[in-house]
Amino acid sequence: MRLVLLFVLLLPVCLATRFHQKGLFDFMIEDEGSADMAPTDDPVISGFGPVCPFRCQCHLRVVQCSDLGLERVPKDLPPDTTLLDLQNNKITEIKEGDFKNLKNLHALILVNNKISKISPAAFAPLKKLERLYLSKNNLKELPENMPKSLQEIRAHENEISKLRKAVFNGLNQVIVLELGTNPLKSSGIENGAFQGMKRLSYIRIADTNITSIPKGLPPSLTELHLDGNKISKIDAEGLSGLTNLAKLGLSFNSISSVENGSLNNVPHLRELHLNNNELVRVPSGLGEHKYIQVVYLHNNKIASIGINDFCPLGYNTKKATYSGVSLFSNPVQYWEIQPSAFRCIHERSAVQIGNYK
């Protein structure tokens, strides 16, 4: 009789549909009727493994607790967690001990909460954390004592008004830094704040109130995005030392001049975005630049194009040909431009002119 009863109890388990994960955030079991399961106030226990916080989904060391209206970080998170997703909740504070025992965590997603305070010791246990996403919160400053293992920090759409050098000290592994859409001013960026970030390759400080290129940017930088700010001019000092820079975004500012020699400081530049500014002429130095391929100058006040503005005086001195030059929505008339001004551009479709109103 006991054997029959045991067989009856085990039969549903044997016939259960297997879970097939299709992607990193695919946590739903494709099983008909699974949505009819009654919720429980008890934590979910999977086999003999760690407890999964109530209402969260746990699989393959990924813990997803997003879109649950949480007001604090769940307790008793599985210690083997490598990715913790807490986005789209109502968390206001990150406290010391919230991430205790999560020594294997690689990615922490805290996007779109109401976080205004982070304890200086909150991230202390996270010795292996590589990606920290803090965007769309209420932070006034970046937290101190961020893990030295970090490679990516994203904190756009906060209330950050200061960037202190001490915050970035020791963050030698950071490659990506995103700080756009914050009430940040040039005076709020401490001189040399980013110098200690020896591997920093990508930085975006767009849609803020800065009026100049931050000083002391590391030479490792390959992409610098400063679009949508209040920068009025580019001087040579602002680009000094950026010998590895390949992409520079300065669109939607108020730039009226680019100092002579500025582009000499970025010898490996390939893309220059200066559209939607107040330029009255093509920046000097483009003709002599060997590697630049894309130049966006549309929506400015350029009234004339010089014969040597884009191409060098001699032939075969430019190592890379242009793949895109945009000049539309400028006062210059296309019939006033000498054809030889584009003599180093092999594809006619690479040049866009006209449509000025």
Curated annotation (Swiss-Prot):
Q: What is its main location?
A: secreted
The residue ranges crossing the membrane are none
Q: What keywords would UniProt list here?
A: Disulfide bond, Extracellular matrix, Glycoprotein, Leucine-rich repeat, Proteoglycan, Repeat, Secreted, Signal
Cellular compartment(s): Secreted, Extracellular space, Extracellular matrix
* Family in the record: Belongs to the small leucine-rich proteoglycan (SLRP) family. SLRP class I subfamily.
Name the source's superkingdom: Eukaryota
- Glycosylated residues, per the record, are 46, 209, 260
**The organism of origin for this protein:** Gallus gallus (Chicken)
Chain's role: May affect the rate of fibrils formation.
- Which residues are assigned to the propeptide feature? 17-30
Q: Can you summarize the PTM annotation of this record?
A: The attached glycosaminoglycan chain can be either chondroitin sulfate or dermatan sulfate depending upon the tissue of origin.
Q: What is this protein called?
A: Decorin
- Span of the secretion signal? 1-16
GO CC terms in record = extracellular space
